[in-house]
Amino acid sequence: GCGPVIGIAGSEKKCQMIGELGADAMINYREENVAERVTELLPDGIDVYFDNVGGAILEAALDNLARDARVVLCGSISEYQQEHRTGPKNYTSLRASEADMRGFFVYNHAADFERAEVDMAGWIKAEKLRALVDISDGFESMPDALIGLYTGENLGKRLVRVMPGEDVIF
């Protein structure tokens, strides 16, 4: 296994949820200095960082990489609404730590979806994986559900059940 696993979220409720999912420690980026807290929790640096946020959180991670670390870029929600996207200002931290940074786009792995679905269903059944979903009901809830992703209102995967009572979810 790996460890310790550190979760970063923007509310106490989300940090509590991360702890319940098994993280060893949580950082509330709205209340704490992320870079300082990462240094405290991981004095030898980050070995693997999976980024969905970008911006200042990614920069804090890049400043705290262990030698030969791996950084995976999956999303950058902090940048999606920005007119001018800047990317990490401190990307040269990768050179000093001899780290690797690469992108991950789930749809490039479509050939693996069926196998992944079977594997993950097994993990859920064996209680090795918990799927957290935040479901809004009704087609008319779609705009608010989308906006909620950008404002941090969701707890888990945000889905919309188009027809309440049905299993058709987007």
Regions found by a protein language model. Name each.
Residues G1-A60, E83, Y107:
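Adenosine-nucleotide cofactor-binding segment
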Residues M26, M101-G103, K157-L159:
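Conserved beta-strand scaffold positions in the cores of enzyme catalytic domains, especially
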Residues F50, L62, A121, P143-L146:
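Non-transmembrane alpha-helical segments in soluble domains
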Residues I18, A56-L129, M163-F170:
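Glycine-rich phosphate-binding loop and adjacent beta-alpha segment
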Residues E114, E140-P143:
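Residues in well-ordered alpha-helical elements
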Residues K128-I135, P143-F170:
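C-terminal capping/lid region of NAD(P)-dependent oxidoreductase domains
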Residues C2-G3, G45, K125-L132:
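A local structural motif
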Residues A25-R30, D134-S141:
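Short acidic-hydrophobic, aromatic-tinged amphipathic segments that line or gate anion-handling sites
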